[in-house]
Amino acid sequence: MTSIMLMFAAATGKLATVMTGALPTTGNGSTKTVTVFTPRGTIYDRNLLPMTNAQTRTVAVIEPTAAAVAAVSGQLGDNAAAALEKLRSGSPAAIEVPSEFECGDCLKYTVPLRYGEGRLASHVIGYVDALGAGVTGIEYAFDDVLGQNEPLKVTYRVDAVGRPLAGVAPEVSGSAEAASGVALTIDTQVQRLVGSVAKDRLDKGAVIVMESATGRLLALASFPDYSPTAVGEA
């Protein structure tokens, strides 16, 4: 893994180190493909602690069998209406499920949750749009690095009416793990302390902490804050 120093214009110069690695290979060549998850590079603090992708969720790729439909309906109920409609039409479906979900005709994957609980430095990190492209902050500035990952896909061989062939194992390509990431000069311990103190004293404004010897940005808290998963509510 190589390291490339890049500049990010935000209050100060030195902010991020980009880490790149080899991309995973993918396989194509079947009739029906389900995209399970498109990984995005992790944003780390200066100590390589993850500031994104720190938590996980479970995604299941489900074959359109009677047993699978019964499992989804029985365990997920109305929360899986769209997936059930797809399964009943004869197409496989990918759906987020509880980790304890059980189904004989499915593949389960643990994938990163981009923004989880206890997020820090929202204005620095920024957020992505519905298509997974960076809109603001580091997500936008390093979108070409964070977004250069092959999606995890499951490909089925199907019959003449588009239903997966019984007894034929699907082909899995790609990975849920990103091949690249960005390391910031932000220190999550300092960031957490600054955010905690400032939110009790500031309705509007910002607090910046810099390393005097180097000018590196250690923390930046801006208020009002926002959730990257509910930007419209900010």
Residue ranges of predicted features:
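Periplasmic/cell-envelope proteins involved in peptidoglycan metabolism and beta-lactam response
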Residues: 1-233
